[in-house]
Design a protein with these regions (language model features):
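Proline-centered loop/turn at the N-terminus of a beta-strand
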Residues: 25-29, 76, 93, 112, ...
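Conserved hydrophobic/aromatic beta-strand scaffold that supports enzyme active sites
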Residues: 56-58, 103-105, 115, 389-391, ...
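Beta-strand-turn-beta hairpins that frame and shape the catalytic cleft
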Residues: 73-74, 91, 108-113, 384-386, ...
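A conserved amphipathic helix/loop scaffold
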Residues: 78-80, 86-97, 328-329
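A glycine-centered loop/beta-turn motif at secondary-structure junctions
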Residues: 88-91, 97-141
Length: 540
């Protein structure tokens, strides 16, 4: 398989393959950029599309083929591209198209060469797994022998080999990934050789530290402790507004504290290494695979951590797994659902949900709505974008129309990567603007209280059990008396690589908004309508 990626086949230094691959007799599937490369090297033509496709689309299967065997002729798929195949290579035939992409799937069955413009590997291509299965088992002749649950014994052996006679110190967050990695390492080495530390950064949600202490106190049998470091993190983040800079600072501060703990605890005798709950999407989004674009630097993928990896002083037992697979491993380990069903929470915590602004700036009127004077991180064409946010004044009723409209607006406006809708406000949208702001104890507490309201109401209503994650984002947009606003960002996903924005029932939304607007300093409540891609789940 030749994967998608942020490059263009016309860029100098873009990834390529030996053209002899396509006459080797091996079955080849090109996905997105991989399809472009296959077409160009086989004598076709690739052009930059008139408009990109970022989000859901409908594939119309033009010709029956083994790749789409047992599937409907119309398929919901997921697009993230601008370049597209304009002319089929000799020997290829058209398999499918979308409304804006005339060549969305192609094949040369004689040479077993297949190309798809969409992404079958993401869960939002509804039957993408079956397409991949058709390629693997019907075209390539592979056998089914992968089951993450059956890998526990193998993973334990890998941990023992990686660690050797040394011991392991874990930094723990209380999330699913670090909990499963920690528990798995204890099972492989025994509790006396695995210690856990939770760094209280001062950036956590309400009640988070108490929850983590209870969870790991029961798992760790006395080898778990909490390191207070709130003042250090807040000092390091003072005046920092760039989201990538925030992530790097937090990651480096974690490394500094790790070194301090190692020295203080006499862990520097060479017998201790660092353990982490890094999973595969962390590596991809940090540009950690050969040709991946940096979308966001994950806090456990900064330079300091990379140096530890190079020095062979780190073990990451889950680095090849996705979130859904990690949960399956956790169940096999006997961890309770109260831990495994927790929504994902970013390592940098509330720091990347507390957006900052350099200067005062009003909202700007455009044809489709209002441009908010802030920017958010997105992923478009498999690469990172950092662009303004479009706000709509009305909150539509029909969920599907709402999400479809957001996708169309982004595809039509190259300068944005996210669409929000105003739910409730103390002042009209044209009267709000940004204020100079940074991460401060006051703003963090405002966000903490807002997040607690949202989590409580989502749990009481059962809404949190119907979604993957519910970020609550504080943005420095408001008026002089109420300088901040809140963005609600509920999404549904399986592995975090793609996500659908989810609409909640209006009665719950109204109740949530009323409680949020009763908090001091909050001006408005917005609702994020954007899928991933083109937006990332987190705003930073």
């Amino acid at each position: 398989m030749i994967s998608g990626g942020p490059s263009s086949v016309y860029e100098a230094g873009s990834p390529t393959v030996d053209p002899a691959l396509f006459s080797s007799g091996l079955a080849v599937l090109g996905i997105c950029y991989g399809m472009h490369l296959m077409a160009q090297l086989s004598g076709g033509r690739v052009e930059r599309g008139e408009q990109g496709e970022f989000g859901p689309a409908l594939l119309e299967v033009d010709e029956p083929d083994v790749l789409f065997r047992d599937l409907e002729s119309s398929q919901p798929i997921w697009m993230s591209h601008r370049d597209a195949v304009a002319v089929l290579p000799p020997g290829f035939r058209l398999l499918g198209h979308t409304e804006t992409c005339p060549i969305a799937a192609m094949a040369d069955e004689r040479r077993r060469l297949y190309g798809v413009q969409f992404h079958p590997e993401v869960v939002h291509t509804r039957r993408g797994a079956e397409m991949l299965a058709n390629f693997l088992f019907r075209i390539c002749g592979c056998e089914r022998d992968w089951d993450p649950r059956r890998r526990l014994g193998e993973l334990e052996q890998q941990i023992r080999l990686a660690v050797g006679e040394r011991n392991v110190l874990f930094f723990l967050s209380g999330g699913v990934d670090s909990t499963v990695a920690y528990t798995l390492t204890i099972r492989a080495l025994g509790p006396e050789r695995v210690h856990g530390v939770y760094v209280d950064t001062g950036l956590m949600r309400e009640g988070e530290t108490e929850f983590v202490a209870a969870v790991f106190g029961s798992i760790a049998s006395g080898s778990f402790f909490i390191e207070p470091a709130a003042e250090e993190f807040l000092r390091a983040l003072a005046g920092v507004r760039d989201p990538e800079h925030k992530r790097v600072i937090i990651g480096e501060k974690f490394v500094d504290i790790q070194e301090r703990i190692l020295e203080r605890g006499h862990y520097l005798d060479g017998n201790w290494i660092l353990g982490q709950g890094t999973i595969y999407p962390d590596t991809i989004e940090s540009g950690g695979t050969a040709h991946a674009d940096v979308i966001k630097t994950h806090h456990n993928r900064v330079a300091g951590i990379q140096r530890l990896i190079a020095a062979r002083r780190i073990v990451e037992p889950l680095a090849s797994f996705y979130k859904d697979e990690v949960r399956e491993l956790g169940r096999e380990l006997g961890l309770p659902e109260t831990i495994l069903s927790r929504h994902p929470f970013p390592g940098p915590a509330l720091a990347i949900r507390c957006l900052c602004a350099e200067a005062a700036e009003p909202v700007r009127r455009v044809e489709d709505g209002w441009i908010l004077p802030i920017r958010s991180v997105g992923v478009q064409g498999d690469s990172r974008s950092y662009r303004p946010v479009l706000a709509l004044e009305q909150f539509p009723i029909e969920g599907e129309q709402l999400h479809d409209e957001a996708t169309l607006l982004i595809n039509r406006n190259a300068g944005i990567n996210r669409v929000v809708s105003l739910v409730a406000s103390h002042v009209p949208l044209p009267n709000v603007g940004s204020r100079p702001s940074e991460i401060s104890p006051e703003r963090l507490e405002r966000l903490r209280r807002a997040d607690a309201i949202v989590r409580r109401l989502a749990h009481e209503s059962g809404f949190d059990r119907r979604i993957w994650q519910f970020p609550v984002v504080l943005i420095p947009v408001g008026d002089a008396a109420r300088p901040d606003s809140v963005v609600l960002r509920p999404v549904d996903s399986v592995d975090g690589m793609t996500a659908n924005a989810v609409l909640m029932e209006r009665r719950l939304l109204d109740r949530m908004s009323a409680e949020l607007l009763s908090l001091g300093g909050l001006c408005a409540v917005f609702y994020d309508l954007t899928h991933k891609p083109p937006a990332t789940i987190e705003w930073e």
